């Protein structure tokens, strides 16, 4: 499971979250979160198969409070909303997704919201984590953080794309990846990805968390969650990662 039911506190009054679209005849809907105190660099947040849930709006607001502009493209906009908030409906919608078009939508969102050559961040979860690693291979100015990404690609696509394992050796920018030891994703695949990233041009770090499974970041907003410690530690590292690489203005 990912973050379809994770709790989310109310958005602070000084944080604006608005619905926008990219220009053109086939616009991509996206949410834009920013602070009324002003924002600087851009972080593109890529969700899991449940799409833009309240939990991701909350993460966007938290990053906006740190001074980032945050955009969340809706890569499922061609498929439509899930019939209900459950896992089966999300998986059914996943099976209708053309991953090639999803990547194109992410690229168009980046082109519309990020200045040419500007260093920008991408934060991806599950399916979105796999997409984040793929776009990182195409953008040397991308700073990438992921949670529970699938090294061989998230299963079930109507039209798949090549997996991160086949693209990671071309990643120039810094990468930070988080997984829980109890995640159902094959650990050998993650080890393969770590080896490839270690030989890639950009710096990389793989973080493992004990007693944490898939979607362990839910502990960030749920005090009694079994992975609360892992969630808070990983989030602090993610925030510091973006502050370090986005603040200096260079992904290298």
UniProtKB/Swiss-Prot annotation:
This is Carboxymethylenebutenolidase. Its EC number is 3.1.1.45. The active site is at residues 126, 183, 214. GO terms for molecular function: carboxymethylenebutenolidase activity. Pfam families: DLH. Pathway: Aromatic compound metabolism; 3-chlorocatechol degradation. One of its GO terms (biological process) is catabolic process. It catalyses: 2-(5-oxo-2,5-dihydrofuran-2-ylidene)acetate + H2O = 4-oxohex-2-enedioate + H(+). Residues 1-28 are annotated as: Disordered. Keywords: Aromatic hydrocarbons catabolism, Hydrolase, Serine esterase. It comes from the Bacteria.
